[in-house]
Amino acid sequence: MLDINEIKNKITLGDSLEVMKQLPDKCIDLILTDPPYGIDITRTGKMGNNNCAMANDYGPEEWDKEIPAKEYFDEMFRVSKNQIIFGGNYFVDRMNINSSCWIVWDKNNTGNYAPCELAFTSFPGVLKKYSWTWNGMLQENMKEKEIRIHRTQKPVGLLKMILADFYDANAGGIVADFFSGSGSTAIACAEYDIPFLAVEKSEHHYKNSLKRLKDAQAQTKLFSGLEVLRSVQNRR
């Protein structure tokens, strides 16, 4: 059995399936992740029926040729209490998607990008919509514009909004991302001082995301992010 403290609050290079197999049941409070959709975006440059910007060098790996095996999803549900999985609509044969509380991310796109994305959640409730501009050069927070290092990178600000709504700051459990990619989940957690673990099997993406995380962790904070989050949630 793996000591979870050995991989906590950092990004680990490796196969997430092998990591999860060494974790006990329900040791993760929330999984917030974005697995490969199996639509071969590295070759086609397309997501759904729309073209994605392909100008940046996002790495040589053909990481999106296949959907992860069902065993990955079985292990994710075994080790975690709750799950938020982007692209859940692509994984209908891999997991139980009987959920009323799906997330819709409206990107406010006007170009050739996919106008929105879906995320499965295991939570009760109604559909939740988040609007966060992510359209080529345009981003919601232009003052803190993110460098895009991954084709399906999720904006940190969006993930922080999702965490504010779904993560129980008073319980203080661990958030995990087993398909870490650009490291956005790890960074969002670090900015909130939420305990996290992240796993990425591509060495290229691992190195780039590690730099992003270290840069974020180097930022000086006046207040504990977790205390701020608790205060906000307790006022609801």
What feature does the model see in each segment?
Residues 1-4:
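Blade/loop signatures of beta-propeller domains
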Residues 6-10:
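Extreme N-terminal starter segment of soluble prokaryotic enzymes
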Residues 14-18, 226-229:
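Conserved SAM/SAH-binding loop
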Residues 17-20, 73-74:
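Short hydrophobic/charged patches on amphipathic alpha-helices used for structural packing
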Residues 23-32, 37, 41-59, 77-236:
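Class I S-adenosyl-L-methionine
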Residues 55-70:
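A short acidic, glycine-rich active-site loop
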Residues 68-75, 79:
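Short, conserved SAM-binding segment of the class I
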